[in-house]
Swiss-Prot record:
UniProt: carbamoyl phosphate binding residues: R55, T56, R105, H133, Q136, G262, P263
Keywords tagged on the record: Pyrimidine biosynthesis, Transferase
Protein name: Aspartate carbamoyltransferase catalytic subunit
SUPFAM superfamilies cross-referenced by the UniProt entry: Aspartate/ornithine carbamoyltransferase (SSF53671)
Primary role: Catalyzes the condensation of carbamoyl phosphate and aspartate to form carbamoyl aspartate and inorganic phosphate, the committed step in the de novo pyrimidine nucleotide biosynthesis pathway.
Name of a matching Pfam family: OTCace
Gene label: pyrB
Assembly and interaction partners: Heterododecamer (2C3:3R2) of six catalytic PyrB chains organized as two trimers (C3), and six regulatory PyrI chains organized as three dimers (R2).
Top-level taxonomic group: Bacteria
Binding site for L-aspartate: K83, R166, R222
Organism: Solibacter usitatus (strain Ellin6076)
Catalytic activity: carbamoyl phosphate + L-aspartate = N-carbamoyl-L-aspartate + phosphate + H(+)
Classification via HAMAP family: Asp_carb_tr
């Protein structure tokens, strides 16, 4: 199997630290007038997205171009899959064009892992079903490091639609490697009990106040209605019980930060006051996405 990035679970702590350290090297490019390097000059990256994406797809495009590579983005509606071609045949066709990496998002959990066994091209997982979203967890970790100075021993509350969240799973895998205390919180219908066994140090609760108490990091998640066959919790009641409001922050550590992988739904997962609060690092996450994905592309291709 060619080297790629399929998930956080398979990475060791040292590998994660190396990616995060390299991402820090790339951060200053954001404020420079000349943002382009020639690290991957002459390389080609194909972004193949079978699910809607703004942040991840655009971030990978910018990351590739800042490293000097060429990037082509293909959506499901613009691929031959929409004409009945199988996913394997589509990927084989792209592989025959000899790109240096394929960045792939798919609604089926495990799709990148399955295809990586058959393709000679490295695959970077940009999100597969409810399974993993490795680069999101890496950029979240970079953001936490920037504000908290460490990952070891932090209390991280992840709140929302845990059941359908690949972001939650990747963050659990990453943070547990650093000894963080992870509290997963949401309605019982969106909080599978087996997730307590996902990694060491994971605790489940349906009480948002318990989750937030003494937290260093509060990570809110979107309710993924598109993955639910029927509503798992009344939409009209969700914000009342699980929406983050300013008063909740008094329960957390004084310097606790608020995160969200986006897209955010104000008035459902968190209030506008919280989204725009000085301890919100939501836009920092977006910014760090570019540096982290530059580090990943360099590692996979360079």
């Amino acid at each position: 199997m060619p080297a790629g990035l399929l998930g956080i679970e398979e990475l060791g702590r040292a590998e994660i630290e190396a990616i995060l350290s390299r991402a820090k090297d790339f951060q200053p490019l954001q404020s420079q007038s000349l943002k382009k390097l020639d690290t991957l000059r002459g390389k080609m990256i194909v972004n193949l997205f079978f699910e809607a994406s703004t942040r991840t797809r655009t971030s990978f495009e910018i990351a590739a171009k800042r490293l000097g590579a060429d990037a082509i983005s293909i959506t499901a509606s613009g691929s031959s899959v929409s004409k009945g071609e199988s996913l394997v045949d589509t990927l084989n066709t792209l592989g025959a064009m000899r790109p240096d990496a394929i960045v792939m998002r798919h609604s089926a959990s495990g799709a990148p892992h399955f295809l990586a066994r058959y393709l000679p091209t490295p695959i970077i997982n940009a999100g597969d079903g409810t399974h993993e979203h490795p680069t999101q967890a890496l950029l979240d970790a970079r953001t936490i490091l920037d504000r908290c100075g460490q990952l070891d021993g932090l209390k991280v509350a992840i709140i929302g639609d845990i059941a359908h969240s690949r972001v939650a799973r990747s963050n659990v895998h990453l943070l547990s490697k650093f000894g963080a205390k992870i509290v997963l919180c949401g309605p019982a219908s969106l909080l599978p009990v087996e997730l307590a066994q996902l990694a060491p140090g994971v605790v489940l609760t349906t009480d948002i106040r318990d989750a937030i108490k003494d937290a260093d990091v509060i990570m809110m998640l979107r309710v993924q209605l598109e993955r639910q066959h029927e509503a798992s919790f009344p939409a009209s009641e969700y914000f009342r019980f699980y929406g983050l409001q300013l008063a909740h922050l008094d329960l957390a550590k004084p310097e606790a930060i608020v995160m969200h992988p986006g897209p955010i739904n104000r008035g459902r997962e968190l209030s506008s006051e919280v989204a725009d609060f000085q301890r919100s690092v939501i836009l920092n996450q977006v910014e760090n996405g570019i540096a982290v994905r530059m580090a990943v592309l360099e590692k996979v291709i360079g």
